[in-house]
Each structure stands twice: as structure tokens, then as C-alpha cells.
Amino acid sequence: MTNVLFIKANGLPAERSVSVALYEIFLTEYKKSHPDDNVTELDLFEADLPYYDVTMMSGLHKEAAGETLSPEEKRLADIANSYLDQFLAADKIVMAFPLWNFSIPAQFLTYLFYLNQAGKTFKYTANGPVGLVADKKIALLNARGGIYSDGPMQSFEMSLSYVKNVLAHFGISEPEMVIVEGHNAKPDQAKDIISAGAKEAVELAKIF
């Protein structure tokens, strides 16, 4: 049985968020097209995601070195590792997220920090870091109200580009993508822009 992890990184309802609308459309079609797969949903705005602070970092580093952790270090390291274990157990992962203030929501950033662990998602070598989870199949559903694919705002796009770089660090270099952009910048075209993205999400879900 294929294990599929759906990650939603936006706390707004679908009627107010294009990335959440894409998530729900993709999820519905995926379940319809792959009825035998085991689907798990992770809502990062509802999840327990303690800030990636010095105590958590210390705990994870001590754990990797085989050292003794304090009770609080162990508690926080266990939380981070629980999300990492869930990620590692998935054969396919779908990530839906917006561009907010040129980047990603803080909850999503924290989650990705949890995943970024040497010896688990990547390893250090004499020739630099090498990803360890290249076998994962990933779909990215990204929405941004402005135009960032080209033009004067292109260099400000640090949402999709950041996530792609993190995944590349893990060895996942060619994720599937559905990108919806410009619906706020071009309100007269918003309906058509969003509709086109929704259709693209449906078609990808069928074959993902």
C-alpha cells in the first residue's frame, strides 16, 4: 500500500486561500483516483510545532552524537523526530503553501527545520552534502497573488524557491508543481487564473 502525506501550510479557509483550495481539490481527486492508497493529512496550523530553539537543537545534536539529553531536550527532540519519521514513512508527499511576505508561513519553516537532519534526510561527504530521500515523490501546490515568475518581483520569490532548495538538499530535485500566481495583481483575471490552476491540480492528482 502506498503511503501519502498531505501537508497543508495555511490556516485560512479555502474560500479565502488559493493554496488551500488547491489542497482540497488535489486531495479530493487523489482519493478518487487512488482509492487504495493510505492518505494522512497534516495541518501545520493545527499541529504542535514548538519553535526550533536552542534546546531543541541541542537535543537533536546530542541525540545524533549518542550523548545524554535533558528531559526538556528529549521532549523537544522527540517532537521533531515524530514529524521526521512521518515524512520518512511516506512514499508520496503533497505540500500546499502560499507565498506570504515573500517567504513561507512560520509553521512551515519550523516543520522543514525538523526534517533537515544529517544522517536522516541528507549526509555530509567529502564532496559536500548528499540527499538521502531521493525516492520520495513530491507535489508542490503554491499560490502567490502577485507576479513572481518574471519581471521586477522575480528575485523576491522566496517561497517556492526555498522549498525546492530544501527538497533538493534532501535529494528530491524534480518535484511536480502546480503554481497559481497573479490573481491579486490582476483581479479582472482572477477567476480564470484560479480556475486554470484548479484544473491543473485535478489533472496532476489523477496521475501522481
Swiss-Prot record:
Annotated gene: azoR1
Sequence similarity: Belongs to the azoreductase type 1 family.
Cofactors: FMN
UniProt-listed Gene3D superfamilies: 3.40.50.360
Domain of life: Bacteria
Transmembrane segments: none
HAMAP family noted in UniProt: Azoreductase_type1
Subunit structure: Homodimer.
Keyword annotations of the record: Flavoprotein, FMN, NAD, Oxidoreductase
Cofactor binding summary note: Binds 1 FMN per subunit.
GO molecular function, a single term: FMN binding
EC number: 1.6.5.-, 1.7.1.17
A Pfam match: Flavodoxin_2
Catalysed reactions, semicolon-separated: 2 a quinone + NADH + H(+) = 2 a 1,4-benzosemiquinone + NAD(+); N,N-dimethyl-1,4-phenylenediamine + anthranilate + 2 NAD(+) = 2-(4-dimethylaminophenyl)diazenylbenzoate + 2 NADH + 2 H(+)
Record InterPro entries: Flavodoxin_fold, Flavoprotein-like_sf, FMN-dep_NADH:Q_OxRdtase_AzoR1, NADH:quinone_OxRdtase_FMN_depd
This protein's name: FMN-dependent NADH:quinone oxidoreductase 1
Binding annotation for FMN: S17, V18, S19
Function: Quinone reductase that provides resistance to thiol-specific stress caused by electrophilic quinones.
Entry-linked PANTHER family: FMN-DEPENDENT NADH-AZOREDUCTASE 1, FMN-DEPENDENT NADH:QUINONE OXIDOREDUCTASE
UniProt-listed NCBIfam families: PRK13556.1
Species the sequence originates in: Listeria monocytogenes serotype 4b (strain F2365)
